[in-house]
């Protein structure tokens, strides 16, 4: 996979506008937007860890997930991504770093599974998530709700910071235009849109070059060199999950190596 040969210049001139500094006064929109920007400012240049456990395993409990979060923060993580209302609530009791919360729902009525419902967004905020991750692809949500309508519903109810999980530059540009606060490459390779082998660092570079909001590199990061490359092309922060926090898949990887030898 080809990468850009030089770092991509980042444009975050949106920050002063969000803080309501233009015109010499603060309005309600500017204040709420500034607070959301602050959540991502805290994540700039560091590692976010996705704390998780395979469904149905003995470690799939809020107590374990929160202990896992506490451990990675002690090791230097500056943010946590976590699935599930109770997991988020438990994590917030243990760590002081920003938490990106989401709810995974696998529904028969929609291919969207990352925070597909408005109630999920509101409950995550109530549980303490400073940032809520949502599927920002152009697929329909339950009951035929478009992404545009979903964002409208969210902003009618809450000013919580929204991280848009996307699969393409087109989805990212739409998410930015609808007021999402940052973009993550989480869904690259997980929809019908073709993508190169993960991690999709090329997409990170394209997003960083074209967007005015932070870009979170996520999906398939297993090596330090990959993380460094993502930062080099313009990532605001990098989120790593399985390579750090999934002992089930890591154990399977080594066991399969033994069986295949």
Predicted regions and their residues:
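Hydrophobic faces of well-ordered beta-strands that scaffold small-molecule active sites
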Residues: 47-51, 80, 99-103, 132-134, ...
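Alpha/beta catalytic cores of nucleotide-metabolism and tRNA/nucleoside-modifying enzymes
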Residues: 3-6, 21, 26-38, 54-59, ...
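Active-site-adjacent beta->alpha loops and helix N-cap segments on the catalytic face
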Residues: 59-61, 81-97, 112-117, 136-154, ...
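Structural motif
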Residues: 75, 94, 127, 157, ...
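Glycine-rich phosphate-binding active-site loops on the catalytic face of alpha/beta enzymes
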Residues: 52-54, 107, 127-141, 183-194, ...
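Conserved N-terminal beta1-alpha1 strand-loop-helix module at the mouth
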Residues: 18, 27-126, 162, 170-177
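Conserved, mostly hydrophobic/aromatic
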Residues: 72, 91, 183, 230, ...
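N-terminal amphipathic/hydrophobic targeting modules at extreme N-termini
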Residues: 2-9, 15-17
């Amino acid at each position: 996979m080809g990468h850009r040969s030089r770092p991509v210049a980042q444009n975050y001139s949106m920050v002063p506008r969000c803080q309501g500094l233009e015109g010499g006064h603060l309005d309600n929109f500017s204040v709420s937007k500034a607070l959301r920007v602050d959540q991502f400012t805290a994540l700039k240049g560091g590692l976010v860890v996705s704390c998780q456990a395979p469904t149905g395993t003995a470690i799939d409990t809020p107590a374990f997930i929160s202990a896992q979060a506490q451990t990675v923060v002690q090791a230097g993580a500056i943010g946590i991504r976590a699935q599930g209302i109770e997991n988020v609530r438990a994590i917030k009791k243990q760590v002081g770093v920003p938490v990106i919360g989401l709810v995974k729902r696998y529904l028969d009525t929609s291919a969207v599974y990352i925070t597909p419902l408005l109630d999920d967004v509101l409950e995550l905020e109530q549980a303490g998530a400073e940032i809520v991750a949502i599927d920002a692809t152009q697929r329909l949500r339950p009951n035929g709700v478009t992404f545009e309508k979903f964002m409208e519903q969210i902003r009618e109810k809450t000013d919580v910071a929204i991280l848009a999980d996307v699969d393409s530059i087109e989805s990212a540009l739409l998410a930015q235009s609808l007021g999402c606060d940052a973009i993550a490459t989480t869904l690259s390779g997980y929809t019908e849109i073709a993508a190169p082998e993960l991690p999709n660092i090329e997409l990170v570079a394209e997003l960083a070059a074209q967007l005015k909001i932070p870009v979170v590199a996520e999906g398939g990061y297993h090596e330090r060199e990959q993380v460094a490359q993502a930062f080099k092309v313009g990532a605001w922060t990098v989120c790593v999950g399985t390579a750090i926090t999934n002992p089930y898949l890591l154990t399977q990887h080594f066991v399969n190596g033994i069986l295949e030898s």
